[in-house]
Amino acid sequence: PSVSILSKSIFKFKPKIIIHLAAQAGVRYSIEKPRVYLNSNIIGTYNIIELAKKINVKHLLIASSSSVYGANKNLPFKETDKTQTQLSIYASTKKSTESIAHSYSNIWKIPISMLRFFTVYGPWGRPDMALFKFTKGIMNKKKIDIYNNGKMYRDFTYIDDVVEGVCSLINKPPSLKQLGKFKNDSLSTIAPFRILNIGNTNKVYLLDFISAIEKELKTKAKRKYMSLQKGDVKITLSNTNLLKKIAGYNPKTKYKTGIKKFLKWYLNYYN
């Protein structure tokens, strides 16, 4: 929505909690259309934070991304790891929103939680995501593109787990009073600001992921093996110990179960 429409809604309802999930997502498209990502992700998030400041929200939760870990080689990824080597424009915009949010939190003491999602999949997802593209290709007997010759791992996280993870944090705003309370905490030392991973904590081999889809559809994929694409990372894997300590929650859906649930929805929705 336009900023004016957004402002009217925010000032009308004056929510105590704001969960900001809107963004322009996707690594490859960000290389083609970087300005779209700058406007949507950076300016869009700035607009939300500015409005949150004006109504004194009790907790602002903002979606970030595992892509901010970039070339980080420490596995699993922890919130306290250094994140200065983003590999795509998309990842850079997400890292930028984290920095902007921290500055606002420091100056105006807005309690902000940045949530780094790991490869979210499931019903009602984006059609450009791997699971959608693989499913459509296999069903239509078209070749599916497999990057880096399939030598990739992803921490696939089912949408229900992401939603539950976010909801578990709603009433857990960061506070400077919590300094030193949790081990390996990402809580800022100067602001009520914290970063949290929401992931499945399992790295899944891409070819195993595809095989699980084939098994459910009882159809073999026609595969087109390709090189690693610009901006892509070879592996993602989350450490969610902080999420468990703070909110008592750990994502639990196995990828084969998630694929089965997705395909049931997909076949029904697309008939």
Please annotate each region the language model reported.
Residues 138-271:
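C-terminal substrate-binding subdomain of Rossmann-fold SDR/epimerase-dehydratase oxidoreductases
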Residues 1-120, 249, 253, 260, ...:
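N-terminal Rossmann-like NAD(P)+-binding domain of SDR-like oxidoreductases, especially those catalyzing
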Residues 96, 100-104, 134, 209, ...:
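Hydrophobic alpha-helix immediately C-terminal to the catalytic Tyr-X-X-X-Lys motif of short-chain
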Residues 68-69, 120-122, 152, 162:
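Conserved sequence/active-site signature of Rossmann-fold short-chain dehydrogenase/reductase
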Residues 29-30, 71-73, 124, 156, ...:
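Short glycine-/acidic-enriched loop or helix-start segments at secondary-structure transitions
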Residues 42-50, 128, 160-163, 167:
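Conserved active-site region of classical short-chain dehydrogenase/reductase
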